Amino acid sequence: MSLVIPEKFQHILRIMNTNIDGKRKVGIAMTAIKGVGRRYSNIVLKKADVDLTKRAGECTEEEVDKVVTIISNPLQYKVPNWFLNRQKDIIDGKYWQLTSSNLDSKLRDDLERLKKIRSHRGLRHYWGLRVRGQHTKTTGRRGRTVGVSKKK
């Protein structure tokens, strides 16, 4: 960061219901939004013609608005399908980039659907056990530890 702070520097930006640190580089600062990682923020900033070396607080209102529209409508700006975080949605078969509260609600809906159809994954979620095939004999224990009593 340069020694002189510009006049229109914003220390905290509010983008998509998320506080973004204005002192960080814009590509890294965008990852504070849930559902936006480093690769996705990089491609969004390139589509919006925003300089990747500038700080987030130096961005103008037009640049921020452009970034928000690209994040919310990536397919209109020719972001490839395989780059999005929700591919072939089970309900409508479309491709989406879910962010913030939409991501949370879709994940909750998916888990509820798995529990409702009583699939193996849904039952493991319901029981609070590991889902992806991990061993559970010794690790992942919760509650009180039961030790071995010593013989007198």
Swiss-Prot record:
Keywords: Cytoplasm, Phosphoprotein, Ribonucleoprotein, Ribosomal protein, RNA-binding, rRNA-binding
GO BP terms, alphabetized: cytoplasmic translation
Subcellular localization(s) per the UniProt record: Cytoplasm
Keyword Ribonucleoprotein included in the entry's annotation: yes
List of residues that carry Phosphoserine: 41
Cellular component aspect of the GO annotation: cytoplasm; cytosol; cytosolic ribosome; cytosolic small ribosomal subunit; nucleolus; small ribosomal subunit
Short name of one Pfam family: Ribosomal_S13
Gene Ontology molecular function terms on file: rRNA binding; structural constituent of ribosome
Role, per record: Located at the top of the head of the 40S subunit, it contacts several helices of the 18S rRNA.
Family according to the record: Belongs to the universal ribosomal protein uS13 family.
Name this polypeptide is given: Small ribosomal subunit protein uS13
Organism: Drosophila melanogaster (Fruit fly)
Lineage of the species this protein comes from: Eukaryota, Metazoa, Ecdysozoa, Arthropoda, Hexapoda
